Amino acid sequence: MPTYRFNYLRFNKLCVSFFRSKFDKRPFASQKFPENLVPDNSSNDANSQPEEVSSKKPWYVDEKHNLFPKKAHFDAVALPPIPKGAPNFLADVLNLLKKKYYATDLSFVNSPADSFWCDSDLILLASCNCGSEVVSATNGLLRLLKQKNVGPVNVDGLTSASRRKILERRMRKRSNLSNRQLNTSENNWTCLSIENFGISIHVITKNFREYYKLDNIEHVKDETLYSDLEHGKQSRVSLTSKSTPDNSLPPNFINNHSNVFRRSFHTCNFSLKSAASLYCDTQDILLNVNSQNLTSTLEKYKKMHLQNPNNFSLDFTLSIFERLRKDSSLQLTTKDINTLFSTIALSPTKLSMASKHSKNLVSERMLYLSLMYKSLVDLKTIDSFSLKLLFLKFMICSCMVKGESNFFLDNRIFLLERIMNRYGIPMTIDTFLLMQFILAKSNRWSEVWRRWDNLRKAGVVFNERLYNHVYLLAFESKNERVINYVLTNIFEDMVSQSPPIPASKLMATSLKKCVQSLPEKYAHSFPSVRNYIAKMENSMTH
């Protein structure tokens, strides 16, 4: 008698399939509409039955407009009209942003012809919901522009692949730190600059766009940069000169007159001794000035002004500038303007190192820099863009006052930085290094590292000059914590950078100073830094 083996596994599968087919109550099990979604047709025909849906389509296909209203919402987004004379590829850019990346609030902005906060003739703004959508839309635009052969496209705001690897490696080493502490957050603003057509495309999150008020940027005037920087209740009399006027006169006597009258009034109230010495120095400085020795004369005056602040004033510096400006035989160059700006921005104080007195000096510097800038705009000696960048650089420089043992930093330096960011004014490398120097000397190292990381996020490739500058700042600070941070994180960034930083004797000297300034307990620490220094020194000797 034959024997049969019972297949329990097959039996279990058959049982499960049977019970599923009989008792499955899921909406997809039967190809009919669920009762709650069946339309009420009782008014038309009481005996009518709901129609069965085709077996090839599930029930939710006919209800897609009710279930997925998001697509219908984005289809309703209107595209802005393309300006006259614009290139044809802008239509494809708008369609790509709308249909594929669901960008909203698409709009064009025409930058004024005399504006210095933008090099582009036309600006396109697009908003996304989050930082990841900003990155996706930017990468998609890069691929489209490459297909259109529009020429070189500069991208700002995207994090490079090598930088992401460094941050991920630090995250694995320090699991107790969050993404925010390691600055691994998403990109909230990117900019694509098409050089051949003078077009900039800004892809930004909605929160950032609302905060920076980019839609009103075409109505911005340049006067915003140098007017009302004080935003306080301080009288304009204290901003005019360090000399005190006659107290017998009422305060409104000075306030009700023009700036020229107030400057003349304060100048006439100098003491007889100061006026006599000032007159002698004036005759020595401005004697036989011509176009050949103008630069050397201004440099000589700058040296005298910085070394003898009791004999000179900002009023006198402005009067020298006005005399040179009105002389048709003399022509001020960029170097001469730089010397005059630096003389005002670095003017020392005759008062004690009190916070109130230092703040008044910063206000005076800003006022006289603004007055000189207004005169240079009318003079048109250099182009407007270079002049305004130079003006902003020395406005930042004027916010720091050097004392006998410490530095005073005015908080208006952060207001200037916000103005530059809000109006899209580019910060040059020289201005960035100046900002880092001022913050480091004022012991604001958290602000130094935050700006360093922001520059890294913008995709800027650091060179030897930037790294050497931060090494020297750390060495001069004599701060053990700062030097440790530089020899770990900053050095790791430099070694991992592609293309690599070329070996130089200056770099080896700066790193060696940082290592030697540490206490003896770090004698065997930082082996990678020590090996790098030895390798660079050996390569320079052979």
UniProtKB/Swiss-Prot annotation:
GO function term, MF aspect, one: poly(A) RNA polymerase activity
Record keyword Transit peptide present: yes
Xref: InterPro entries: Atp25, NT_sf
Recorded superkingdom: Eukaryota
Region Disordered, annotated ranges: 34-56
Primary localisation category: mitochondrion
GO biological process annotation, one example: mRNA stabilization
Keywords linked to the UniProt accession: Membrane, Mitochondrion, Mitochondrion inner membrane, Transit peptide
Membrane topology: Peripheral membrane protein
TM annotation in the entry: none
Localisation per UniProt entry: Mitochondrion inner membrane
Transit peptide: 1-28
Record's function text: mRNA stabilization factor specific for the 0.95 kb oli1 mRNA. Also involved in oli1 ring formation.
Family: Belongs to the ATP25 family.
Protein name: ATPase synthesis protein 25, mitochondrial
Record organism: Schizosaccharomyces pombe (strain 972 / ATCC 24843) (Fission yeast)
GN (gene name): atp25
